[in-house]
Every structure is written in C-alpha cells, then in structure tokens.
C-alpha cells in the first residue's frame, strides 16, 4: 500500500446509494459455508481484500469457490474431507481471518501455519491463544503473541470461559474451536460484542444457546451443520462514513439503502441521535440480521456526548469517523473504555488524534479513548492512512470540511473493506450540484 490520493470533493452531498456487503458477516458466511458439505451461495458479499484472503485459504483446504455477479458459490467437500495445506496460509491485513481461523483450524486439527502482512505481525494474538490453549489447542506463535501462528493436531476440550475484553474476534475463535469438542463450551461476555457468529451458527443449523451475556455450544455441534444460502446486508461500518459526511456538510441530504442494523452493531445510530443529528430509518426488516434504509441530513450545532460502556463495542469500528463528527459538536466530547482501538490495524486512538490534529483539529488521546474539542479544519498538511482502511476513509470525509484539496498517502488501504469508496462519494457530490 503506497499510493497517494488527492481528495477534492465539495458538498452538498445528495442522492441514494448502497454500500458493500458487511465484512464481518462475509468472513463468517464463507467460513461456515466452507465447513458444510454441499453448495451454499452467498449473495452481495464484500469482495474486498480481507474477505478474499479468507476465500483463498479455504480454496487451499480443498473448497471450490466460484465468483459470479454479486455472489459467490461455495461447493465444499465438507470439513471431514479438508486437505492439509502445504504452504503458509496468508491472511494479508485481515485480523478477522487470522484470529477466527486460529480457532477454527485448532478445532479441525489441521496442521497449518497462519501468517499475514507486516501490520498483522504487530497485532497481539495472545488474547486468542490463551483461551484456545485452555481448550487443549496445540498453537504457538512468536513470543506466544504474534504471527506466524503454528497449529498442530490436538483434541479440543470444552471450557467455561469468562471473557476479559469485549472482542467479537476472541469470542468467535472460541466458538469456532468449540464446534469440534466432545464437551459443551460456555462463554460469558465482558460486554456484548457483535453477534454475527451466533446468528450465522443458527442460520447454518448449528445449535447454540444464548442467555444474556452467556453463550453455550453443545458437544460436537459441527455435526449439525448444513449448507445454506445467505444474503449479506450492507456494512454499517462502511455506511458510517457517508452518515458522518452528510451530517457535517451543509445542504447534504442522502439515503443509504439495505444497511445492516444488527443491535450489536448499530451504536453509531444511537450516538448520532444523542448528538441531535438528523437521521431516520425506514424500510426496516426484521430477523436475526435486520436491515434498513438510513436517511441523513446536514445538522449544525450538534450536542456534545460521552461515549462509554456497552455503547463502545457496538460502535468500535466507527469510532474514528465518530471522533471526526465530534469535532463539529457545540462542546467537548469524550470517548472512553475504548482500549480495543489500540489493537486494530493501527492504534486507532493515536492515529485518529495524530492525523486530525495535523489538519488543525483538537483531539487529546487518553489511555482508553479520546477527548475531542470543538475545532475546525485549518491546515491542508499531507496526511497518511497508516495502511488503515478506516483511517483513510475518515480522512477523506474530513476533507469535506475544507475547500482545498487534501493529499492522503497510502489511500489504497481503503480497498480492504470498501473498493469503490471514492467514486461513491463523488457520485453523491455530483448529485448535489
């Protein structure tokens, strides 16, 4: 990732769009469809770089995956007939692929090596390895914390585990490993994190019990899996950039259709409402993965908010662009209890503050979040995504607050989750003219 992009987009933004399929759900649907013997079709998946890494790995395990227009067809021999890979399983920049497959491959007992790019090599894996080792997984890494992760066959045991952090990736790694255990596994969450693994278990016929923050799988749950088709909703994390762009750009009025509004992911909607933002939902569908159309208009004089507690995991990936939104509030805003931001593609607490402060905004990083003061875009210094897709898109949205072009280094990082992000933003600009 080394290309730069000069962003020169001015408002207002107007029109109707859809965003790519949800990244979290696409990963999980690929994994579960690949485990189930037979044919599953995934409609409207995200075909970004991260999800392609997940597909590539299952191809190496013997799964046939065919891409068609807006869908992928997965023809699996079933988990019982996976082949042992004879090369390193490359996860690229995808923490989801790395951490979830650490659990799944441990459960499968397939000898394998997981390794990613330089960024993945710096991200902690002990949070996944510790519970997996308690489950009798044979998994090791550099300093028992970093990739490459070496996985060898073992017999997975069920555990009763209390989560220490609100992390959907850690939870999912445990649940995926537990599918192959002869004992039940009980997991209690610290705070409820995104529940796509649980909803997709049920969708693919895997028994799972959920009572509040406690989740339980049954012995040998994998034996119940069945192939299923799945329609992936639009990613609310991708929609977030357009929500904020419309809120901060005078005259803007946009609608984003078919966005997933799973309650464990819809924190940004609640935050915008607390700030007094002009946001409305329509065409709301019901079900395990509900969707809606989101209508957003420019809103001046936003209220100050404190974002903390169980709201944080419901908006964890949106917090960088929410921090930008908070610079336009009438008083200082606080984000706290967000330590998880430190172990994303970058330390997003520091990266968000550093990049926005370069542009003249006023953000103070803290040990677990940010203090964001009302401030304006005052400098067109060159900024850098730091190879973090969400930082790159957040900076592009920030450029709407300036009448001058903004140069963003390593902007191609956005392709990890949103190929075509910039053309879609320009489309709304053109509609607004």
UniProtKB/Swiss-Prot annotation:
Please tell me where this protein is predominantly located.
cytoplasm
Please provide an example of a Pfam family that matches this protein in its UniProt record: EPSP_synthase
Keywords carried by this UniProt record: Amino-acid biosynthesis, Aromatic amino acid biosynthesis, Cytoplasm, Transferase
Which EC number(s) does UniProt give? Answer: 2.5.1.19
Q: Where in the cell is it found?
A: Cytoplasm
Q: Which GO terms describe its molecular function?
A: 3-phosphoshikimate 1-carboxyvinyltransferase activity
- Known pathway: Metabolic intermediate biosynthesis; chorismate biosynthesis; chorismate from D-erythrose 4-phosphate and phosphoenolpyruvate: step 6/7
Give the binding site residues for 3-phosphoshikimate.
23-24, 28, 167, 169, 317, 344
* UniProt: phosphoenolpyruvate binding residues: 23, 95, 123, 169, 348, 390
Tell me which residues this entry annotates as catalytic: 317 (proton acceptor)
GO cellular component: a single term: cytoplasm
> Could you tell me what reaction this enzyme catalyses?
3-phosphoshikimate + phosphoenolpyruvate = 5-O-(1-carboxyvinyl)-3-phosphoshikimate + phosphate
Assembly description: Monomer.
PANTHER family, A to Z: AROM/DEHYDROQUINATE SYNTHASE, PENTAFUNCTIONAL AROM POLYPEPTIDE
What this chain does, per the entry, is described as:
Catalyzes the transfer of the enolpyruvyl moiety of phosphoenolpyruvate (PEP) to the 5-hydroxyl of shikimate-3-phosphate (S3P) to produce enolpyruvyl shikimate-3-phosphate and inorganic phosphate.
Protein name, as recorded:
3-phosphoshikimate 1-carboxyvinyltransferase
Question: Organism, per UniProt?
Answer: Staphylococcus epidermidis (strain ATCC 12228 / FDA PCI 1200)
What gene makes this protein?
aroA
């Amino acid at each position: 990732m080394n290309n730069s992009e000069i962003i020169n987009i001015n408002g207002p933004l107007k029109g109707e769009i859809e965003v790519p399929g949800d990244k979290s759900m696409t990963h999980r649907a690929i994994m579960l469809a690949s485990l189930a013997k037979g044919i599953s079709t995934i409609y409207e998946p995200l075909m970004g770089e991260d999800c392609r890494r997940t597909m590539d790995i299952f191809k190496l395990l013997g799964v046939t995956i065919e891409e068609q227009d807006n869908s992928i067809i997965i023809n699996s021999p079933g988990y019982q007939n996976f082949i042992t890979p004879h090369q390193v399983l490359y996860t690229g920049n995808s923490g989801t692929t790395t951490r979830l497959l650490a659990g799944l491959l441990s459960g499968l007992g397939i000898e394998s090596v997981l390794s990613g790019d330089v960024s993945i090599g710096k991200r902690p894996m002990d949070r996944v390895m510790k519970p997996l080792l308690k489950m009798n997984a044979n998994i090791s890494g550099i300093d028992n914390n970093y990739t490459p992760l070496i996985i060898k066959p073992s017999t997975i045991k069920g555990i009763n585990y209390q989560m220490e952090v609100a992390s959907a990736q850690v939870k999912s790694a445990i649940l995926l490993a537990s599918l192959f255990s002869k004992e039940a596994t009980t997991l209690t969450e610290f705070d409820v994190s995104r529940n796509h693994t649980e909803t997709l278990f049920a969708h693919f016929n895997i028994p799972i019990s959920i009572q509040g923050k406690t989740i339980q799988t049954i012995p040998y749950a994998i034996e119940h899996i069945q192939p299923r088709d799945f329609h992936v909703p639009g990613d609310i994390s991708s929609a977030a950039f357009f929500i904020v762009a419309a809120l901060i750009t005078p005259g803007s009025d946009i609608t984003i259709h078919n966005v997933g509004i799973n309650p464990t992911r819809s924190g940004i909607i609640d935050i915008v409402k607390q700030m007094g933002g002009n946001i409305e939902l329509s065409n709301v569908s019901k079900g395990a993965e509900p969707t809606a159309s989101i209508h957003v208009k420019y809103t001046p004089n936003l209220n100050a908010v404190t974002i903390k507690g169980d709201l944080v995991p419901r908006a964890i990936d949106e917090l960088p662009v929410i921090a930008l939104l908070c610079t336009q509030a009438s008083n200082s805003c606080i984000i706290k209890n967000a330590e998880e931001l430190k172990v994303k593609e970058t330390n997003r607490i520091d990266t968000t503050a550093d990049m926005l402060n370069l542009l003249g905004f006023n953000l103070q990083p803290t040990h677990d979040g940010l203090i964001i003061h009302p401030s304006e875009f005052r400098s067109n210094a060159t900024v850098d995504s730091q190879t973090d897709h969400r930082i790159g898109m957040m900076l592009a949205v920030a450029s709407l607050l300036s009448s001058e072009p903004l140069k963003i280094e390593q902007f191609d990082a956005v392709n990890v989750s949103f190929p075509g992000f910039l053309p879609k933003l320009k489309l709304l600009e053109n509609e607004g003219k």
